[in-house]
UniProtKB/Swiss-Prot annotation:
The lineage of its organism: Bacteria, Pseudomonadati, Pseudomonadota, Gammaproteobacteria, Enterobacterales. InterPro entries: Lysidine-tRNA-synth_C, Rossmann-like_a/b/a_fold, TilS/TtcA_N, tRNA_Ile_lys_synt, tRNA_Ile_lys_synt_N, tRNA_Ile_lys_synt_subst-bd. HAMAP family: tRNA_Ile_lys_synt. This is tRNA(Ile)-lysidine synthase. It catalyses: cytidine(34) in tRNA(Ile2) + L-lysine + ATP = lysidine(34) in tRNA(Ile2) + AMP + diphosphate + H(+). Pfam families: ATP_bind_3, TilS, TilS_C. One of its GO terms (cellular component) is cytoplasm. The N-terminal region contains the highly conserved SGGXDS motif, predicted to be a P-loop motif involved in ATP binding.
Amino acid sequence: MTLTLNRQLLTSRQILVAFSGGLDSTVLLHQLVQWRTENPGGALRAIHVHHGLSANADAWVTHCENVCQQWQVPLVVERVQLAQEGLGIEAQARQARYQAFARTLLPGEVLVTAQHLDDQCETFLLALKRGSGPAGLSAMAEVSEFAGTRLIRPLLARTRGELAQWALAHGLRWIEDESNQDDSYDRNFLRLRVVPLLQQRWPHFAETTARSAALCAEQESLLDELLADDLAHCQSPQGTLQIVPMLAMSDARRAAIIRRWLAGQNAPMPSRDALVRIWQEVALAREDASPCLRLGAFEIRRYQSQLWWIKSVTGQSENIVPWQTWLQPLELPAGQGSVQLNAGGDIRPPRADEAVSVRFKAPGLLHIVGRNGGRKLKKIWQELGVPPWLRDTTPLLFYGETLIAAAGGFVTQEGVAEGENGISFVWQRNA
């Protein structure tokens, strides 16, 4: 068996390979070492993710270090901790792995993983069990976008048996994860109990399943093409989804548009029930309502006849964050990012006797630059078109008890720079 590298892989000279130390990734790394020999300008690194789920996890790290040392491949070991609630162990481990991959990738590097034909078959069956449509039944693509670069699966057309033959023929050593024998996990149940039975009855079942997945991917790609104009018409420059153009659409067409909009936000693919709730409970909620549908760590909200996909954040209206060293950036609570004061702008610097702080609400009537008369903060937010969920999380700059400016919003008359070197109040949000 030889590894036929995807042509898109050959355009990249920098590769990061996911290396668990198991059979599949060991064969992949072995063949990529050969690729490096044939392409002297190519750079190859490996990453091993230590989940801490097995008593053997430290021994696996040692094994991977020894293999990479033997093959002269730089190895990055990422230790991750899984959350104690929310997703199941399988989903948590996968999420943690791919977050580690994204953190480790260097500019210009592509990620290469060792999924093979049997994995593709299992992925298809899992999607079928969940009741997925063409997008889910497309299973895994040989090349896909990931973390601003590409994720490539060059073994996707090869069976697990072929990889085992290669490993034995070349005297490779690999680890066996004992959890792979635990059929309480859905994927293991399919691998150990279901797929062997199907393969016994239909020897080419994995190949035909992969063909069906490819046809689903083709249909999904065609839908993307046919709906591109509709999506562009419904989507605003800010990335929100306008409700009015979708009112006259059929249910199926509207659901397809919402799915593609969410995919563009890197959101998890919603179930059919979730799509119905997005439309009925959020888009069509009473005009005076502020509807919100939680989907994991994110929310779908409606504002100004548009759907918004936002990260869930706890309101900060009661928080006061002192900023004693205001020449340095200030970390905000609840993962809201950071703020800093930069040279150049319309805001006056604080006087020596003024304590600087960041707050998230301001009482009384406020007089802001560009507006006549005083207004309450709620009215200012409405006039500026600030969505309700941002109104108690947007950082407000205070000198003493005086509101000076809102990040990205306004400057008060008490905070305007006059005949002096002004500064700007910049909010750097977390992704």
